């Protein structure tokens, strides 16, 4: 079994990190995370920077002190959120060659977000795993946009690595730094990005980009392109994924770390996961349709009156 060693926890792989976007699990607690046997959480650099602010978080002992959570904390770079907002409305700012310019609330005040700033903010958070700044794209973006994304992702990765090395020079316990492989749906660009990031040297590598097509279908082929571009001796991180069936498919092609908002979102909308009968152990015979879990609609008239456990195969409190 592979182990991911961080300053706060040693984590058996594959592993899933629930999203605690603003430093909290929606409709749950970190005690719930521990009870579920999960050893880490993902938190959002950009959202925490806007509210409550990186300086305040640092003054309270970083994210571990601010949240009271003792497991591993992974923070993203904030690049995806800035890309999404600017892509939705260009008046929010622009992605320049050396930095991202962002104007919150379309006001006069502007945020200049550089690769160095990205790393400095994550050090203020005291993150166990930090992500380098990248330029995100959509699979349908034209080739010239994908090429620019790879070029900026590599250049920004170099600057993130240099800033990270400077800030960790005197540390005994060092956090981990992951690079992000971009390239859209072009295999050549994915391989180029992975090769150049490997030359810089990172502790792990994340999938960059959008994993769905225009109709919302899961693009496993793009995830495989990115996985093939990452060194096999390093951890491969499927950022923002996924559903149980996605995780199962992605483990098969080499990914070992996952995070996603979907499990907590499903629960808030009263949909719970339960095992398909016979699939709750490694010896279960896979069904022809590949399904190994099913939805239980907890507030349906049938289920709301049941006194038994949600799933007899699960030892959770429900």
Which residue stretches match the model-derived regions?
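Non-catalytic, usually N-terminal nucleic-acid engagement modules in DNA/RNA processing proteins
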Residues: 1-170, 290, 300-303
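Glycine-rich phosphate/ribose-binding loops and adjacent secondary-structure elements
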Residues: 151-154, 163, 167, 174-311
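Local cysteine-cluster metal-coordination motifs and their immediate loop/turn environment
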Residues: 313-318
